[in-house]
């Protein structure tokens, strides 16, 4: 089982299973741990699936795994390896059995892994650590002495399981517990018999062993008892037994539960021990000690035997231990197969199914119980229990299990303590329930199967349903079983020592099972049970329970913050009593559980350590369990769990949380935020929650493994994943597992488990690489994210990984100064933790916390958030922290405690902290993310993500390396870089616009890392390396900074304390943390732990962090953006910037990887992830970030993802300092030697008569150097905009002066556009473009600052927009596409120091891409924000600053590229200074630029060049096809070439235009070619053959538009379009249809040539030039006959066509003034027609004559109407268009169904019913045809009239001899297959083809009459529509086939009548009919 993945890979091909092997932070097995971590990752992925099949067993297994992990970790290499060996030797029979059942063993592993996933993952991790804590000693003693048999079997089983993972998976897993394996396999049968015999009395035996004391004694003292317990366990493993036991516990009192738990405990103990042994072996194997694995399988066997619950044992062993110990062999193997299958942690069926064959006995009881359990488990409670159990245990193992845990194992009891917390978590099931409620589906038992999918194997679904159904005893039993099983597993692990807690846990599980489960108390549940049953560990257990309970209540009760608060508030209360109460209450009722939780929390305070642990466990359980349940479930569950935890905090942030989705609602946060919230909540809940977070972290690792197994795409689950990093070993295993699974699941995980991805990514990679390294990475994460949470666990993990022994020792020493203290403190919470633990799990924990800024940061953030969210909580937390002597440290400490007790550690990185470790654990997930481009196509700084296994390593390397490298690079001192990592990698989620989505898969998430300061530290370097590509620093960075800022501002004391702590913790935990944070330390100090914390608590911390980082420098909002900026600008170069960067990077990774591990690679993958990241941040940085979040959940994320770090919500935030702060924040920022140029432009436009007063103020380094005021007047164009541009010329990098600016513009332009929001946008862009380009291009000093602002002053005109558009255009394609990549470049290259214009307020999200470059780097995120801010023009200025980033990028990337192409850039530089002037003649800078401009007639955009600036915002364009015309700036897109991933319309050889996506560019002999992908096929098209439809062009308009973007509403809306048109206003570029060559064509030519061209129907097919063809008909652009201008001029050129009147094509260009008198005024209400899209057509003279002649035929009413119409002044299409545009109506040049559908209402305006193409198309499509009188009347009344009163008749019916009224019609040609035969291509074939297709025809075949050589299969057609030119051969054939042959009149009559009519009803229907 090479941990690296050779065997693991093969065995864990799916690697979805037991990554959850508890990873102890065993210094000894650091490398092993690392590998184990990877295994765990894999196992984690698999675990969810495995877990499903066996809930209760899972618990048992988990318990044991925890023990195992704990022992393995704690004793890991020293004691536990011995144990392993001993067990192996001691239990050779079992070993042989297992060996005999090698395949079975494997199966067990695989199958159980799913079980494990839920149980093992959650339970294993939690239980194992808990067990390790409780039973660490016991296990050592007991397992060595008692578990020889069971242990041997279990271990072996697991080992065997590895081999036969696919087959025996579930059964063996269950058997894995010691009995199950045997029960399942013949080899196990020996044990099985024992076990079975015990099984029968197992539960009862346990019950009989019920004396908690006895059980505990058994476990702790009585080896025989333990063996008995083990036997009981073996028997008990029968899931039914646990269920029963659980039930009994519930029904009975805690003692029975205890007793029962105790049996489980022994089982767990053995399993745990074996798991540990396995872990050790695995670690060794990871280290290369595969030999040990062989023996360990025996131990695994024993453990499995021990954990009678196959699930339990296998979970523990297979998942937790085996995977780790055996290199994930059995676990890994199991995870792959089982994981996928056993998605639901609680899904009993999976396990049972697999298990039933192998361990029928075991399964028999178990299935029933488990069946019900699965529901519980699926609900994440079980899963959470299991998961949390596991993570917690893992944490315990990692931290407490590592060194402290070793000691604890030696001590024995301490380990158990952690389990008790697990029990509480179980008890807190409600948390899971609550989260599950979020993902309600999780609850239903049915859900369980759903999680079956590897991705959904996160048990999230199960817990709530089952838990909530706990009322039924049977169900309760089952539910409880699942929950209890999970709990019990945990309990068993820890309950061996303390059965009472287990009982409690059961009790909780039972009644408050849903609460508990809901609460995600999986881990804690067992612990709680342990607590309940074992008051000895009451302190720790109680605390844990308390925490769990708080978590539970929080999570459960709508994520009740209050509960959390109360938990936090009640920390002082007796946790133990609480626990019992909790137990009973949980039993009794959910609410009670919550109360209990509160009480527990209260008690928690007393035993902070325990609480922390409990909370950790809770979180872990929560995370683990929830994360484990299933991707979706997991997301939900995780979301639930974390969210519930977060809920307290996130409740307030929930919007952000919810942004990701319902599940994602929490999921977004859940992965990161959830953890952040967990962190926060833990903070809020004081230590308990912190511990929980740590646990979560710890569990996260497991979960991560599990999650990746499940590939729970849900980032939320990832949160658990975050916990994954809980133990280095686990991480290693997880890492590896993730690696293996990464490819398959990474993307998925990333996308679905974005959090998980991060967790696994960040930690596993390093972990996989080196135990120490991952730990260091974790540490980094910790550091960078201030993931003290993670730090303790992750630090142990990371440090252990990196410096496995050294770090671990250091960490453990620092973390838990008393080696055992780590776990022990939890146990000894009351004693040791009482004061330190109050705040920090224990002094060590505190130290660890201190040592781990991440914990501190988390704490700080948490505190900040707490203080913001719940001051009371915070106070409680603070009080505890103060007890520790560090108020802020309290949270930090809590995290630290968690860290100290692994659980807390993992928990802390909820958002950021966990992320680093998670990254380690998650990399595979990220890899999966990459594999499945999901949301962030661009791996966030995780170039390795794509590689599954390597991705883990690499991701770890990259992410973690970013985290880790800086840390490593800096040498442990660089650990300080961890915070840097936080800063380093910023996952920014940009608004997802079509462009963004199209342009870069990862565009959504930008992993930004501060370009400037990022590299200052080693961490920075790492961050940059990671973020550089994507510059996602901003999201996390922003979050971190914001958080820091928040903390600094909102929670200075905590922040300061945190800082102090940070400073302190280097002292206390300084060894590790100092090493880790040395570099980071300063950063932290400088940033205030906030920075590191901020990643952890990104939500609050973003601002807080920013504040901390740039708190003094800028406001909170600014802080967020400034995180990067500050890093870059503020020159927080090394320290602050690094932390910021690290934070950012971590957060970005975190975003991707659930934010749990900021370091986790950028998990840009998912919006959810990003959202989660932000949410997580929100959670952590509730106040600041929350605001930010609220404003721009996605945006902020995006922005942050962009590396803008704009906490968009706060406004343009730091980048532009909100524009206002821009000066101060921008001005001071030029430390990079960039001259800070800032340009503030205020443009006021008066509608109608536009009088534009443009004031340009240029600042250089804050000094006003120039002020210009220009006044412009334009014809009615409605736009108003104010824009400020901060330009740092240097920032742009001086691409080419103007060019750079433009490039800047492109990014900035987009930003500006956005900022400007509509009309203003363009000007803004101009200013922003140039100015902003300049401003944003802080680096771009090229050109005068003013020059830089080559904002064409005429912002209305393209001039203004021009610069920005130009920039946009030149840089845009690159920018947009490279947004992410460019982002990194720009940010990295351009010293994002300059504030990025965040103001793109006006830009719609789609502009995101546009801002794309700008926003992408930082602006993208901002752009995202912009869209949100879009309406505010003020934001605009912010946008400018932000733009610089983009500009920077653009400059670097496309900017220079494009700009160089276009002269516009230089002009811009020149024009910049005279922006105002530029505005008037923006053309100056754009002349000669290659652009894509809109042909006014048909609305299509064609490539061409600007030949000169005509003024008034218009430019003369020479199109490539030879046409020339004046085009408004807004209709000019400065995007040549068209950006990649942009949807375009390409002219195929068949002369049909069809949509495609640009996938590449190439130049040959000066000619540009586009690689267009259509329907999966790519083809090269010439530049001229690629055009943009109106819709496609509008998407780019915001970003690349030369003129102000005027769409007020989303671009997709007709209203927006109309606004744009409005801007054009006078110019009337549409000049309607020039008279088309054919009347038909003319009337409809302008619209679309044919149906095929529908996308770009404007051009008639007739026009040969590809684009022209689209617009051939009536478009100005169409051929000369149409004469663009002439056509426009022609008022009503009449075409010859009978059906189509040329008028349609011709625009009546009457003098508006003259017309106004007749037509009515322009609407005073500028939004009169907003939302309406209009098609205008005009009756031809023939139509008028015909209608008049037929009036008599029609009803008098009709004639009267007709007369009325005649009385009305002549219809002037042009003037009517101007009226409609003036009222914000959108004019469709040609019929376009898509555009019509996007409008609120689409109307055809005509003077009368006519037979034009547009009219027919509207009849065919059901678009109402309205008289132009409606427009006239509406304008007169200045309010919309009811158009139904102005409906035009459909036409004259030949059959009825009258004019028929228009009526809504269904497709008249539904499913009709038509053959068109004619010699007129455009006016007949294409025209009628389009009309028929619009009318619903199934297919229309065009056949040219002259094409005699073509054979036509007439048999497939229903009708032939032709004209006299129809060849005789066709007629003959049709006649033979009895095919009706009709003329186009038949088609027309069908349209008029509204239904298909007879083919021979009228003579005119004959194709050869000759009109009279």
Curated annotation (Swiss-Prot):
Compositional bias per record (Pro residues), positions renumbered to this chain: 442-452
Outcome reported for the amino acid change (mutating residue 13 to A): In 28A: Defects in recruitment to double strand breaks (DSBs), abolished interaction with RIF1 and abolished ability to repair DSBs
Annotated localization: Nucleus; Chromosome; Chromosome, Centromere, Kinetochore
Cross-link (Glycyl lysine isopeptide (Lys-Gly) (interchain with G-Cter in ubiquitin)): 1685
Job of this protein: Double-strand break (DSB) repair protein involved in response to DNA damage, telomere dynamics and class-switch recombination (CSR) during antibody genesis. Plays a key role in the repair of double-strand DNA breaks (DSBs) in response to DNA damage by promoting non-homologous end joining (NHEJ)-mediated repair of DSBs and specifically counteracting the function of the homologous recombination (HR) repair protein BRCA1. In response to DSBs, phosphorylation by ATM promotes interaction with RIF1 and dissociation from NUDT16L1/TIRR, leading to recruitment to DSBs sites.
Keywords: Activator, Centromere, Chromosomal rearrangement, Chromosome, DNA damage, DNA repair, DNA-binding, Host-virus interaction, Isopeptide bond, Kinetochore, Methylation, Nucleus, Phosphoprotein, Repeat, Transcription, Transcription regulation, Ubl conjugation
Record-linked InterPro entries: 53-BP1_Tudor (IPR015125), BRCT_dom (IPR001357), BRCT_dom_sf (IPR036420), BRCT_p53bp1-like_rpt1 (IPR047249), BRCT_p53bp1-like_rpt2 (IPR047250), Rib_uL2_dom2 (IPR014722), TP53BP1-like (IPR047252)
Outcome of substituting residue 892 to A: In 28A: Defects in recruitment to double strand breaks (DSBs), abolished interaction with RIF1 and abolished ability to repair DSBs
Organism, scientific name: Homo sapiens (Human)
Region (Interaction with dimethylated histone H4), start-end ranges: 1495-1523
SUPFAM superfamilies: BRCT domain, Tudor/PWWP/MBT
Notes concerning its domains: The Tudor-like region mediates binding to histone H4 dimethylated at 'Lys-20' (H4K20me2). Interaction with NUDT16L1/TIRR masks the Tudor-like domain and prevents recruitment to chromatin.
Disease: A chromosomal aberration involving TP53BP1 is found in a form of myeloproliferative disorder chronic with eosinophilia. Translocation t(5;15)(q33;q22) with PDGFRB creating a TP53BP1-PDGFRB fusion protein.
Name recorded for this polypeptide: TP53-binding protein 1
Skewed-composition ranges (Acidic residues): 538-549, 1272-1285
Effect in UniProt of substituting residue 1495 to A/H: Loss of interaction with histone H4 that has been dimethylated at 'Lys-20' (H4K20me2). Abolishes recruitment to double strand breaks. Loss of interaction with histone H4 that has been dimethylated at 'Lys-20' (H4K20me2)
């Amino acid at each position: 089982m090479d941990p690296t993945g050779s065997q693991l890979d093969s065995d864990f091909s799916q690697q979805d299973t037991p990554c959850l092997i508890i990873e102890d932070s065993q210094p000894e097995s650091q490398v092993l741990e690392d590998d184990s971590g990877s295994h765990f990752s894999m196992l984690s992925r698999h675990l969810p699936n495995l877990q499903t099949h066996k809930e209760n067993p899972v618990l048992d297994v988990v318990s044991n795994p925890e023990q195992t992990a704990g022992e393995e970790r704690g004793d890991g290499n020293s004691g536990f390896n011995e144990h392993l060996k001993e067990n192996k030797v001691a239990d050779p029979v079992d070993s042989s059995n297992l060996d005999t059942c090698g395949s079975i063993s494997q199966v067990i592993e695989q199958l159980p892994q799913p079980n494990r996933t839920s149980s093992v993952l959650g339970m294993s991790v939690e239980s194992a650590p808990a067990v390790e804590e409780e039973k660490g000693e016991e296990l050592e003693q007991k397992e060595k002495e008692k578990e020889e048999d069971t242990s041997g079997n279990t271990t072996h089983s697991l080992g065997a399981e590895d081999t036969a993972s696919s087959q025996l998976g579930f059964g063996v897993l269950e058997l894995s517990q010691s009995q199950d394996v045997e029960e399942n396999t013949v080899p196990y049968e020996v044990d099985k018999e024992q076990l079975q015999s015990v099984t029968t009395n197992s539960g009862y035996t346990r019950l009989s062993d019920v004396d908690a004391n006895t059980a505990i004694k058994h476990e702790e003292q009585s080896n025989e008892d333990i063996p008995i317990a083990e036997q009981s366990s073996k028997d008990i493993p029968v899931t039914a037994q646990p269920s029963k036991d659980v039930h009994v516990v519930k029904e009975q009192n805690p003692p029975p539960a205890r007793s029962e738990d105790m049996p489980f405990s022994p089982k767990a103990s053995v399993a745990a021990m074996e798991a540990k042994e396995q872990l050790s072996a695995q670690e060794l194997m990871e280290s290369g000690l595969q030999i040990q694995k062989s023996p360990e399988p025996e131990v695994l066997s024993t453990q499995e035997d021990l954990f009678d619950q196959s699930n339990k044992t296998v979970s523990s062993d297979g998942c937790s231990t085996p995977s780790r110990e055996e290199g994930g062999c059995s676990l890994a193997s199991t995870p792959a197969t089982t994981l996928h299958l056993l998605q639901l942690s609680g899904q009993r069926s999976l396990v049972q199914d697999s298990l039933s064959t192998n361990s029928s006995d075991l399964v028999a009881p178990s299935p029933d119980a488990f069946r019900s359990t699965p529901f519980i488990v699926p609900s994440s409670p079980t899963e959470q229990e299991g998961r949390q159990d596991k993570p917690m245990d893992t944490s315990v193992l990692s931290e407490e299990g590592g060194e402290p845990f070793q000691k604890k194992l030696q001590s024995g009891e301490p380990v158990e303590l952690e389990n008790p917390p697990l029990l509480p978590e179980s008890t807190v099931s409600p948390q899971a329930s609550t989260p599950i409620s979020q993902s309600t589906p999780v609850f239903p038992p049915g859900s369980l199967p759903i999680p079956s999918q590897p991705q959904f194997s996160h048990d999230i679904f199960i817990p709530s349903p089952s838990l909530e159904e706990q009322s039924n005893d049977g169900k309760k039993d089952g539910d409880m079983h699942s929950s209890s099983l999970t709990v019990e597993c945990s309990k068993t692990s820890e309950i061996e020592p303390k059965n009472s807690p287990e009982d409690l846990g059961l009790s909780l599980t039972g009644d408050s099972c849903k609460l508990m489960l809901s609460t995600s108390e999986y881990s804690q549940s067992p612990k709680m049970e342990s607590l309940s049953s074992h008051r000895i560990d009451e302190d720790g257990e109680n605390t844990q329970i308390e925490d769990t309970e708080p978590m539970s209540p929080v999570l459960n009760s709508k994520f009740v913050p209050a509960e959390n608060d109360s938990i936090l508030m009640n920390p002082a209360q007796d946790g133990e009593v609480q626990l019992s109460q909790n137990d009973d209450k949980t039993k009794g009722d959910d609410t009670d559980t919550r109360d209990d939780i509160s009480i527990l929390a209260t008690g928690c305070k007393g035993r902070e350590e325990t609480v922390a642990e409990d909370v950790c466990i809770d979180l872990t359980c929560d995370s683990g369990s929830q994360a484990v349940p299933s991707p979706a479930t997991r997301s939900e569950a995780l979301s639930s769990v974390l969210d519930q935890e977060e809920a307290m905090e996130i409740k307030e942030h929930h919007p952000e949380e919810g942004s990701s989705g319902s599940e994602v609602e929490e999921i977004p946060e859940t992965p990161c935020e959830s953890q952040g919230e967990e962190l926060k909540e833990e903070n809020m809940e004081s230590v308990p929650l912190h511990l929980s977070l740590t646990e979560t972290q710890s569990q996260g690792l497991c979960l991560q493994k599990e999650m990746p197994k499940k590939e729970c795409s849900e980032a939320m689950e990832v949160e658990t994943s975050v916990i994954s990093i809980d133990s280095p070993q686990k991480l290693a295993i997880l890492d590896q597992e993730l690696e293996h699974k990464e490819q398959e699941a990474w993307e998925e995980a990333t996308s679905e488990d974005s959090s998980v991805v991060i967790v696994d990514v960040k930690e596993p990679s390093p972990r996989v690489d080196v135990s120490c390294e991952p730990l260091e990475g974790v540490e980094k994460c910790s550091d960078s994210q201030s993931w003290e949470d993670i730090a303790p666990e992750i630090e142990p993990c990371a440090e252990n990984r990196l410096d496995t022994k050294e770090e671990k020792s250091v960490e453990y020493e620092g973390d838990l100064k008393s080696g055992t203290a780590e776990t022990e403190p939890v146990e000894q919470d009351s004693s040791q933790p009482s004061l330190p633990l109050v705040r920090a799990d224990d002094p060590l924990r505190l130290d660890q916390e201190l040592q781990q800024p991440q914990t501190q940061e988390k704490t700080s953030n948490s505190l900040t958030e707490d203080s913001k969210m719940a001051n009371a909580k915070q106070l409680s937390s603070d009080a505890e922290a103060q007890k520790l002597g560090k108020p802020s440290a309290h949270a930090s400490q809590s995290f630290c405690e968690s860290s100290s007790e692994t659980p807390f550690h993992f928990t802390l990185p909820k958002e950021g902290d966990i992320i680093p470790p998670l990254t380690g654990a998650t990399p595979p997930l990220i890899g999966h993310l990459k594999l499945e481009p999901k949301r962030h196509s661009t791996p966030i700084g995780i170039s390795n993500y794509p590689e599954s296994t390597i991705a883990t390593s690499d991701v770890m390397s990259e992410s973690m390396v970013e985290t880790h490298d800086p840390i490593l690079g800096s040498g442990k001192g660089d650990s300080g870089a961890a915070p840097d990592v936080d800063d380093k990698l910023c996952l920014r989620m940009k608004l997802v616009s079509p462009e963004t989505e199209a342009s870069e898969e990862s565009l959504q998430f930008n992993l930004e890392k501060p370009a400037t300061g990022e590299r200052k530290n080693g961490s920075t370097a790492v961050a940059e390396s990671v973020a550089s590509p994507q510059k996602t620093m901003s999201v996390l960075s922003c979050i971190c900074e914001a958080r820091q800022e928040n903390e600094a501002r909102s929670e200075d004391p905590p922040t300061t304390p945190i800082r102090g702590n940070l400073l302190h913790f280097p002292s206390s935990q300084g060894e590790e943390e100092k090493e880790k944070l040395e570099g980071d330390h300063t950063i932290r100090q400088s940033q205030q732990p906030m920075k590191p914390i901020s990643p952890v608590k990104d939500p609050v911390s973003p601002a807080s962090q920013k504040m901390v980082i740039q708190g003094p420098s800028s406001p909170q909002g600014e802080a967020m953006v400034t995180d990067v900026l500050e890093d870059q600008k503020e020159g927080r170069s090394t320290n602050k910037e690094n932390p910021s960067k690290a934070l950012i990077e971590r957060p970005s990774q975190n975003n991707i990887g659930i934010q749990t591990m900021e370091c986790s690679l950028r998990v840009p993958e998912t919006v959810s992830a990003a959202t989660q990241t932000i949410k997580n941040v929100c959670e952590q940085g509730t106040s600041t970030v929350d605001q930010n979040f609220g404003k721009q959940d996605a945006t902020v994320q995006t922005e942050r993802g962009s590396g803008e770090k704009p906490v968009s919500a706060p406004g343009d935030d730091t980048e532009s300092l909100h524009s206002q702060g821009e000066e101060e924040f921008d001005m001071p920022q030029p430390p990079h030697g960039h001259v800070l140029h800032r340009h503030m432009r205020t443009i006021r436009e008066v509608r109608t008569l536009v009088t534009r007063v443009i004031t340009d103020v240029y600042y250089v380094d804050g000094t006003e150097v120039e002020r210009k005021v220009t006044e412009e007047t334009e014809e009615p164009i409605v736009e108003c905009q104010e824009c400020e541009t901060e330009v740092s010329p240097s920032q742009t990098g001086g691409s080419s002066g103007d060019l750079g600016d433009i490039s800047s513009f492109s990014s900035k332009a987009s930003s500006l556009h956005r900022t400007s929001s509509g009309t203003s946008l363009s000007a803004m862009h101009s200013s922003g473009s140039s100015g902003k380009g300049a401003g944003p291009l802080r680096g771009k000093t090229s050109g005068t600052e003013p020059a830089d602002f080559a904002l064409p002053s005429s912002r209305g005109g393209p001039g203004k927009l021009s610069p920005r558009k130009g920039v946009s255009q030149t840089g845009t394609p690159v920018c947009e596409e490279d947004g992410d990549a460019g982002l990194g470049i720009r940010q990295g290259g351009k010293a994002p120091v300059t504030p990025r214009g965040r103001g793109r307020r006006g830009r719609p999200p789609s502009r995101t891409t546009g801002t794309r470059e700008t926003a992408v780097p930082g602006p993208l995120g901002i752009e995202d924000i912009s869209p949100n801010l879009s309406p505010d023009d003020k934001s605009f200025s912010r946008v400018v600053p932000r733009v610089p980033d983009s500009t920077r990028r653009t400059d670097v990337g496309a900017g220079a590229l494009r700009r160089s192409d276009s002269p516009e850039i230089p002009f811009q530089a020149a024009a910049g200074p005279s922006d105002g002037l530029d505005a008037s003649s923006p053309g100056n800078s754009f002349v000669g630029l290659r652009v894509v401009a809109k042909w006014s007639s048909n609305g299509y955009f064609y490539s061409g060049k600007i030949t000169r600036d005509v003024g008034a915002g218009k430019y003369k364009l020479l199109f490539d096809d030879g046409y020339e015309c004046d085009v408004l700036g807004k209709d000019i897109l400065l995007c040549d070439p068209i950006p990649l991933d942009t949807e375009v319309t390409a002219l195929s050889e068949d002369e049909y235009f069809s949509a495609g996506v640009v996938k590449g560019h190439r130049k040959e002999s000066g000619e540009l070619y586009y690689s267009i992908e259509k329907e999966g096929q790519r083809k090269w098209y010439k530049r001229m053959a690629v055009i943009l439809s109106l819709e496609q062009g509008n998407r780019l308009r915001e970003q690349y538009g030369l003129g102000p973007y005027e769409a007020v509403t989303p671009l997709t809306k007709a209203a927006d379009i109309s606004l744009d048109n409005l801007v054009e206003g006078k110019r009337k570029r549409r000049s309607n249809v020039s008279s088309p060559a054919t009347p038909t064509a003319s009337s409809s030519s302008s619209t679309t040539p044919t149906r095929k061209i529908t996308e770009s129907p404007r051009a008639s097919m007739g026009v040969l030039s590809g684009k022209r063809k689209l617009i051939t008909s009536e478009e100005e652009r169409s051929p000369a006959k149409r004469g663009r201008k002439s056509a426009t001029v022609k008022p009503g050129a009449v075409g010859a066509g009978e059906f189509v009147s040329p008028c349609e094509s011709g625009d009546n260009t009457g003098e508006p003034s003259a017309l106004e008198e007749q037509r009515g005024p322009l609407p005073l209400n500028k939004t009169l027609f907003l939302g309406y899209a209009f098609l205008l057509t005009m009756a031809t003279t023939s139509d008028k004559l015909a209608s008049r002649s037929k009036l008599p035929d029609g009803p008098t009413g009709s004639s009267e109407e007709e007369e009325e119409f005649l009385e009305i002044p002549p219809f002037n299409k042009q003037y009517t268009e101007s009226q409609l545009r003036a009222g914000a109506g959108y004019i469709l040049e040609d019929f376009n169904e898509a555009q019509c559908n996007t409008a609120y209402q689409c109307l055809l305006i005509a003077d009368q019913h006519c037979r034009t193409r547009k009219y027919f198309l509207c009849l065919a499509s059901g678009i109402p045809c309205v008289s132009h009188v409606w427009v006239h009347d509406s304008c007169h009344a200045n309010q919309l009239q009811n158009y139904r009163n102005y409906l035009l008749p459909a036409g004259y019916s030949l059959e009825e001899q009258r004019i028929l009224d228009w009526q809504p019609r269904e497709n008249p040609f539904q499913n009709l297959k038509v053959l068109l035969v004619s010699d007129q291509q455009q006016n007949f074939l294409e025209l009628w083809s389009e009309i028929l297709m619009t009318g619903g025809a199934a297919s229309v075949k065009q056949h040219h009459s002259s094409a005699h050589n073509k054979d036509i299969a007439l048999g497939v057609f229903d009708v032939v529509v032709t004209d006299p030119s129809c060849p005789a051969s066709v007629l003959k054939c049709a006649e033979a086939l009895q095919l009706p042959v009709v003329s186009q009149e038949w088609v027309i009559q069908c349209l008029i009548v509204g239904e298909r009519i007879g083919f021979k009803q009228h003579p005119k229907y004959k194709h050869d009919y000759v009109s009279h």
